[in-house]
């Protein structure tokens, strides 16, 4: 597990829910290592390089709290001479353009779209409610009257075309 900034809410939640998803699916897991890479590709590459030296072929899956760290893990594997078909199953979060390209190339198995446009729409709706003198907690669908949750969408090779910019 490549985690973002220590104590950062997104890093904590992405780590927690990745683990919960595996447990819910009853996937047998042996955790070999986890470390913070502070959302940075270079730091993630260094961590992965260390793990490859320590664990070698025992690494089957790498969860990264963002796409840059997932790409850093891929960089380390390829720099170590690993063939694409031998890469661990690596996933990230954010559906950034470089990550989508890596999904298309087959080096990144998937990412999760962090819906910036949807977040902006929710922020605008909250602002409009407040400016209109309304309580957003009662006029909008907010959890506990405070939180706007958006669904995350998994992006894999199967649905990649939906997320690529139109040419």
Model regions and ranges:
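Beta-strand segments within the central parallel beta-sheet cores of soluble alpha/beta enzyme folds
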Residues: 1-3, 32, 87-91, 148
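Short beta-strand elements in bilobed, periplasmic/extracellular small-molecule ligand-binding domains
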Residues: 1, 19-41
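Hydrophobic alpha-helical
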Residues: 18, 37-101
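A general structural signal for well-ordered alpha-helical segments in protein cores
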Residues: 14-15, 70, 100, 120-124
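Loop/turn elements at helix/coil->beta-strand transitions in domains of secreted/extracellular proteins
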Residues: 24-30, 56-60, 85-88, 106-109
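Short beta-strand elements at the ligand-binding edges of bilobed clamshell
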Residues: 1-5, 34, 105-117
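Hinge/cleft segment of the Venus flytrap/periplasmic-binding protein
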Residues: 2-10, 20-24, 118-167
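Conserved donor sugar-nucleotide recognition element shared by glycan-biosynthetic enzymes
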Residues: 10-14, 40, 44, 120
């Amino acid at each position: 597990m490549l985690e973002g900034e220590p104590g950062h809410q997104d890093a904590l939640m992405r780590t927690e829910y990745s683990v919960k998803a595996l447990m819910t699916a009853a996937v047998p897991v042996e955790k070999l290592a986890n470390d913070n890479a502070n959302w940075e590709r270079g730091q993630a590459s260094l961590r992965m390089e260390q793990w490859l030296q320590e664990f070698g072929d025992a690494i089957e899956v790498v969860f990264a709290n963002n796409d840059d760290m997932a790409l850093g893990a891929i960089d380390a594997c390829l720099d170590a001479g690993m063939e694409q078909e031998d890469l661990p199953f690596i996933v990230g979060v954010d559906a950034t353009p470089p990550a989508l390209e890596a999904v298309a190339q087959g080096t990144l198995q998937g990412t999760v779209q962090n819906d910036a446009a949807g977040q902006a729409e929710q922020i605008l709706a909250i602002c409009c409610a407040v400016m209109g003198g309304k309580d957003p907690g009662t006029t909008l669908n907010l959890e506990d009257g405070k939180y706007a949750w958006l669904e995350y969408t998994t992006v894999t090779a199967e649905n990649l075309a939906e997320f690529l910019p139109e040419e």
